[in-house]
Amino acid sequence: MSDDRINYLKNKLVQYPDFPKKGILFEDIMPIFQDPRAFGILIDLLLEAVETEFNNIDVIVGLEARGFLFGPTLALRANCAFVPVRKPNKLPGDLVVVSYNKEYSTDSFAIQKGTIKPGQRVLIVDDILATGGTALAADELVTRLGGELVGHLFLLELTFLQGRKRLMAPTYTLLTGQDEAPDGSEFA
């Protein structure tokens, strides 16, 4: 993987202290999507990871909301299906729903029944791996539908939160954030 391409993406990230609340250092990935060159580099690097780290993917599952920014494009380029995992009351039809713990609350994710067939090889994609709670909930949804979870793919990992240790499959990230929270801050 080219250091120049990785550095180009890293230089697009913007940190916002005390957002969305005091003590949080927010890593903003949105500038990547405002620059066509950066977005193209992102998709190329993610596709390279799919081709080298994971074999024969049938389905890419994108997590609401920022997994939707690149998940469908990646699925198109990888010639596989895209399936969204959404918050409650956002999908019609028969659903499988799981609850998961967040830092200060609980939340839920849902997936439509039948969108993943038993035995299909599934890759979960999202923007940032922090504590791993949302990805772990998606793992459970995939396995409940009978999918074979082959891995996770993230744009950015906040390594000091050790979310990778909670996940049920191999995990690949393009970028890593700081190894620890600065000045006792948390990351989001």
Swiss-Prot record:
<keyword id="KW-0328">Glycosyltransferase</keyword>
<dbReference type="Pfam" id="PF00156">
    <property type="entry name" value="Pribosyltran"/>
</dbReference>
<keyword id="KW-0660">Purine salvage</keyword>
<comment type="similarity">
    <text>Belongs to the purine/pyrimidine phosphoribosyltransferase family.</text>
</comment>
<comment type="pathway">
    <text>Purine metabolism; AMP biosynthesis via salvage pathway; AMP from adenine: step 1/1.</text>
</comment>
<comment type="function">
    <text>Catalyzes a salvage reaction resulting in the formation of AMP, that is energically less costly than de novo synthesis.</text>
</comment>
<dbReference type="GO" id="GO:0006168">
    <property type="term" value="P:adenine salvage"/>
</dbReference>
<keyword id="KW-0539">Nucleus</keyword>
<dbReference type="GO" id="GO:0002055">
    <property type="term" value="F:adenine binding"/>
</dbReference>
<dbReference type="GO" id="GO:0046872">
    <property type="term" value="F:metal ion binding"/>
</dbReference>
<dbReference type="InterPro" id="IPR000836">
    <property type="entry name" value="PRibTrfase_dom"/>
</dbReference>
<dbReference type="GO" id="GO:0044209">
    <property type="term" value="P:AMP salvage"/>
</dbReference>
<dbReference type="GO" id="GO:0016208">
    <property type="term" value="F:AMP binding"/>
</dbReference>
<dbReference type="InterPro" id="IPR050054">
    <property type="entry name" value="UPRTase/APRTase"/>
</dbReference>
<dbReference type="InterPro" id="IPR029057">
    <property type="entry name" value="PRTase-like"/>
</dbReference>
<dbReference type="GO" id="GO:0005737">
    <property type="term" value="C:cytoplasm"/>
</dbReference>
<keyword id="KW-0808">Transferase</keyword>
<keyword id="KW-0460">Magnesium</keyword>
<dbReference type="InterPro" id="IPR005764">
    <property type="entry name" value="Ade_phspho_trans"/>
</dbReference>
<keyword id="KW-0479">Metal-binding</keyword>
<dbReference type="GO" id="GO:0005634">
    <property type="term" value="C:nucleus"/>
</dbReference>
<dbReference type="GO" id="GO:0006166">
    <property type="term" value="P:purine ribonucleoside salvage"/>
</dbReference>
<protein>
    <recommendedName>
        <fullName>Adenine phosphoribosyltransferase</fullName>
        <ecNumber>2.4.2.7</ecNumber>
    </recommendedName>
</protein>
<comment type="subunit">
    <text>Homodimer.</text>
</comment>
<dbReference type="GO" id="GO:0016763">
    <property type="term" value="F:pentosyltransferase activity"/>
</dbReference>
<feature type="binding site">
    <location>
        <begin position="130"/>
        <end position="134"/>
    </location>
    <ligand>
        <name>AMP</name>
    </ligand>
</feature>
<keyword id="KW-0963">Cytoplasm</keyword>
<dbReference type="GO" id="GO:0003999">
    <property type="term" value="F:adenine phosphoribosyltransferase activity"/>
</dbReference>
<dbReference type="GO" id="GO:0005829">
    <property type="term" value="C:cytosol"/>
</dbReference>
